[in-house]
Amino acid sequence: MPTVYDFSAPLLAPLLAPLPATLLVPHLDGQPLSLGNFRGRVLLIVNTASLCGFTPQYAGLEVLHRTYRDRGFFVLGFPCNQFGGQEPGSDAGIGAFCEKNYGVTFPLFTKVDVNGPNAHPLFRFLKEEKPGIFGMFGAGAIRWNFTKFLISRKGKVIARYGPAKVPKAIAPAIERLLREE
């Protein structure tokens, strides 16, 4: 699959809406967490699954998280069961799986829908800001597990990456955003 570069991101960044800081996301322990807790941080928001061909990306996501967290970067993982039923487990089971198999320390949240009428408001926002190409759920829909959204310190959705984009390939963009004030 060829790499597609989005040269418009730096030009459009001032026009993009910031991530809603008041939006609550359900942490894996069941407690709601405000996105405002991540204000001023660079984020990589990912819909994840435990039984997917892309599941080994958890390891690469964890490497990114550990490499850059002291500089203000976080990976946020949102399990999703909408693609082939590849995340059938309970929230506790998902957390245990990720910790045991991939040493995941980045924040994981409860299972959410990313498409359709029950899509979590966070993913509705992300798709509005960075619509993808037409997929099985319609224009702008997330096509599969491990779709990634890169968010600047100012809360702007800078880039959207498909599942085949391995985490280490996103490192230069993360570095660039971490250098910006």
Which role fits each region the language model picked out?
Residues 1-36, 56, 121:
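N-terminal "domain-start" segment that seeds a small globular fold
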Residues 23, 107, 158-159:
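Structural signal for short hydrophobic segments within the conserved structured cores
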Residues 47, 72-90, 105-116:
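Thiol-based oxidoreductase modules, predominantly thioredoxin-like and allied folds used
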Residues 93-101, 124:
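Extracytoplasmic electron-transfer domains, predominantly the class I c-type cytochrome c fold
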Residues 121-124, 128-181:
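Thiol-/selenol-based redox modules, centered on thioredoxin-like
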